[in-house]
Swiss-Prot record:
Source species of the chain: Welwitschia mirabilis (Tree tumbo)
PROSITE patterns, alphabetized: PHOTOSYSTEM_I_PSAAB
Topological category with respect to the lipid bilayer: Multi-pass membrane protein
UniProt GO molecular function: 4 iron, 4 sulfur cluster binding; chlorophyll binding; electron transfer activity; magnesium ion binding; oxidoreductase activity
Protein name (database record): Photosystem I P700 chlorophyll a apoprotein A1
Entry keyword set: 4Fe-4S, Chlorophyll, Chloroplast, Chromophore, Electron transport, Iron, Iron-sulfur, Magnesium, Membrane, Metal-binding, Oxidoreductase, Photosynthesis, Photosystem I, Plastid, Thylakoid, Transmembrane, Transmembrane helix, Transport
EC number of the protein: 1.97.1.12
Gene: psaA
Enzyme class: oxidoreductase
Residue spans crossing the bilayer: 71-94, 157-180, 196-220, 292-310, 347-370, 386-412, 434-456, 532-550, 590-611, 665-687, 725-745
């Protein structure tokens, strides 16, 4: 018998009126920082430090409780911003869009929710999107989401927009209330079991359940009527379906039985509403809404159970600390011992894990949005499909770099080696040389071999020797594992889900083509030598990004070059004067360099996606059933050389953005030009030293003094770290906007 000490009960503890609400502080810039508030802004460096440290709560105080409250309060501010943004989207849909026209004819009318005012000729940007409506074509995917939600009028969008604003105000109030009036104590933030239970059961469980309920009671009947061609104005309003059961009974007879089949385990009665079909609805080209309702109900059940698994005031359930400390293998020393203390005392450590998972999940979302398009008519809106993929890939890349940044900050600021003796984290840190040198070898191998295959092909192509190239028609390098995986997904459902009519995604294969309004929604995606080559470029760029970021994390505290690196902090330019060759070694500099390789990696991914889809998936179908792809299937033969990527993708597809002037797409031409300028501007910060600018500034200040117009705040050149931060920000912004303009001008013109 195991006798255990009685565990302390979880108490909800808050501190009343901890900090007075004061607007006077706002009039005192830098009030949050000891160093900034003591000095007046004598130089421009003070202003830069103000911006750098405003949200670095660690630099304001060392009190973890106060830091936790600030983070918690800031989360409500973030939610207020999100609700305000959503409100704006819905308001645009209500006030400036052709949503009702699109709803009536989604295959011929393009979505638009922005109309440019005629001031000095800008109305040229309002293109003809069909149905006599002139506006800017939007590519955010809101129209398909609204249709899937069961929104049938612009009045409903208005109401939702107002509701979102009310929620934004509530969030702002909550942020103020939980910092100034009733601030949680540190123990509340550290009670992980309660937090897991509430987040799993509340946010994910009840959130999924309420969405499943909405889908069943509102979305399904409205979408069924829309699919049948009923005029949206004739369809009952959402609340009528909820209040009047007879309306649902007419569409789904099993509804009349209520919850009886549920409690008698006769669940098959619900097979009209909750299905397991697989594939896509041939009318809309989206997932079957009955499948997605079933999915959300199942997810809700899982998370509601998960939200009751952790031990709080009742003596049953899991203890996170016990789970972690029991997690030991024969070769892993103390295993996960000490990680509980790390994750309950370092929010950077917890944030690093959350960002790594969220970033990966965001990239998974990007890949599912096109392969399993969840909303009606999304699959035939090629510009939206391209935008959603590109957006989620960029966001995922940034979030993963953020994970490495906060992992390094944790090691520099929060890591205590005495509590992590011989656990997995300690063992990883002690094996860092082996990890990084092996990863470096992998990067060299992948780089030379992946790029080498292209160089070989370019050379053979230039010499007129196509028979010696790696291609589907010469020396084949077929992606046999990927093809096996595709085939497995096509054949498996007949054994694992006999009731399903199709596999999870049409992209796996099987021969089915879904077309909507003479446009291809989705078809099996063939993989060949060209995909094998570019996938190894993906492997290379991802591994180099990981190498840079992981090296920054594992060497954040110390290295052979700088054994006391932890004392220098997260970001520093060099190890002081007199030690040459110690610049650009801070953890921050690794994040800086990692961002460039993340940009490389994601760029190749979105280029690959854009060309592959235009070549092998997207296109029109004739009455005879012949599919004509946008670029005529040229990916397999053109993308196997560097020259092919430059000539047949970048140059050939840039013609639309370059020739956009004088058309409704001209804004993209201007963005393309301007973003190139922003990108080039970044090089000025990245390729020149601080001293150059300081000399120039002093010369300019001399001229101002001569004219007696010298400023009171003395101008200073940016520090090395500030210059690099400004440089990478403009590099990424310029590059991403250039790509965005290039993609959208192209795809809107040809789809």
């Amino acid at each position: 018998m195991i006798i255990r000490s009685p565990e302390s009960e979880v108490k909800i503890v808050v501190e009343r009126d901890p900090i007075k609400t004061s607007f006077e502080k706002w009039a005192n810039p830098g009030h949050f920082s000891k160093t900034l508030s003591k000095t007046d802004p004598e130089t421009t460096t003070w202003i830069w430090n103000l911006h750098a440290d405003a949200h670095d709560f660690d630099s304001h105080t060392e009190d973890l409780e106060e830091i936790s409250r600030k983070v918690f309060s800031a989360h409500f501010g973030q939610l207020a911003i999100i609700f305000t943004w959503l409100s704006g989207m819905y308001f645009h849909g209500a006030r400036f869009s052709n949503y009702e026209a699109w709803l009536a004819d989604p295959t011929h009318i393009k979505p638009s929710a922005q109309v440019v005012w005629p001031i000095v000729g800008q109305e040229i940007l309002n293109g003809d999107v069909g149905g006599g409506f002139r506006g800017i074509q939007i590519t955010s995917g809101f129209f398909p989401i609204w249709r899937a939600s069961g929104i049938t009028s612009e009045l409903q969008l208005y109401c939702t927009a107002i509701g979102a604003l009310i929620f934004a105000a509530l969030m702002l109030f909550a942020g103020w209330f939980h910092y100034h009036k009733a601030a949680p104590k540190l123990a509340w933030f550290q009670q992980v079991e309660s937090m897991l239970n509430h987040h799993l059961a509340g946010l994910l469980g009840l959130g999924s359940l309420s969405w499943a309920g909405h889908q069943i009671h509102v979305s399904l009947p409205i979408n069924q009527l829309l699919d049948a061609g009923v005029d949206p104005k004739e369809i009952p309003l959402p609340h009528e379906f909820i209040l009047n059961r007879d309306l649902l009974n007419q569409l789904y007879p099993s509804f009349a039985q209520g919850l009886l089949p549920f409690f008698t385990l006769n669940w098959s009665e619900y097979s009209e509403i909750l299905t397991f079909r697989g594939g896509l609805n041939p009318v809309t080209g989206g997932l079957w809404l009955t499948d997605t309702a079933h999915h959300h109900l199942a997810i809700a059940v899982l998370f509601l159970i998960a939200g009751h698994m952790y031990k709080t005031n009742w003596g049953i359930g899991h203890s996170l600390k016990e789970i972690l400390e029991a997690h030991k293998g024969p070769f892993t020393g103390e295993g996960h011992k000490g990680l509980y203390e790390i994750l309950t005392n370092s929010w950077h450590a917890q944030l690093a894990l959350n960002l790594a998972m969220l970033g990966s999940l965001t990239i998974i979302v990007a890949h599912h949005m096109y392969s399993m398009p969840p909303y009606p008519y999304l699959a035939i809106d090629y510009s939206t499909q391209l935008s959603l993929f590109t957006h989620h890939m960029w966001i995922g890349g940034f979030i993963i770099v953020g994970a490495a940044a906060h992992a390094a900050i944790f090691l520099v600021r929060d890591y205590d080696s005495t509590t992590s003796y011989n656990n997995l984290l300690d063992r990883v840190l002690r094996h860092r040389d082996a990890i990084i040198s092996h990863l470096n070898w992998v990067c060299i191998f992948l780089g030379f071999h992946s790029f080498g295959l292209y160089i070989h092909n370019d050379t053979m192509s230039a010499l007129g020797r196509p028979q010696d190239m790696f291609s589907d028609t010469a020396i084949q390098l077929q992606p046999i594992f990927a093809q096996w995986l595709q085939n497995t997904h096509v054949t498996a459902p007949s054994f694992t889900a006999p009731a399903a009519t199709a596999s999870t995604s049409l992209t796996w294969g099987g021969g089915d083509i879904i077309t909507v309004g003479n446009k291809v929604a989705l078809l099996p995606i063939p993989l060949g030598t060209a995909d094998f080559l570019v996938h190894h470029i993906h492997a290379f760029t991802i591994h180099v990004t990981v190498l840079i970021l992981l090296k920054g994390v594992l060497f954040a505290r110390s290295s052979r070059l700088i054994p006391d690196k932890a004392n220098l902090g997260f970001r520093f330019p060099c190890d002081g004067p007199g030690r040459g060759g110690t610049c650009q070694v801070s953890a921050w500099d690794h994040v800086f360099l990692g961002l460039f390789w993340m940009y490389n990696a994601i760029s190749v991914v979105i280029f690959h996606f854009s060309w592959k889809m235009q070549s092998d998936v997207w296109g029109n179908i004739s009455k005879q059933g012949v599919v004509t792809h946008i670029t005529g299937g040229n990916f397999a033969q053109s993308s196997i050389t560097i020259n092919g990527w430059l000539r047949d993708f970048l140059w050939a597809q840039a013609s639309q953005v370059i020739q956009s002037y004088g058309s409704a797409l001209s804004a993209y031409g201007l963005f393309f030009l301007g973003a190139h300028f922003v990108w080039a501007f970044s090089l000025m910060f990245l390729f020149s030293g601080r001293g150059y600018w300081q000399e120039l500034i002093e010369s300019i200040v001399w001229a101002h003094n001569k004219l007696k117009v010298a400023p009171a705040i003395q101008p200073r050149a940016l520090s090395i770290v500030q210059g690099r931060a400004v440089g990478v920000a403009h590099y990424l912004l310029g590059g991403i906007v250039t790509t965005w303009a290039f993609f959208l001008a192209r795809i809107i013109a040809v789809e």
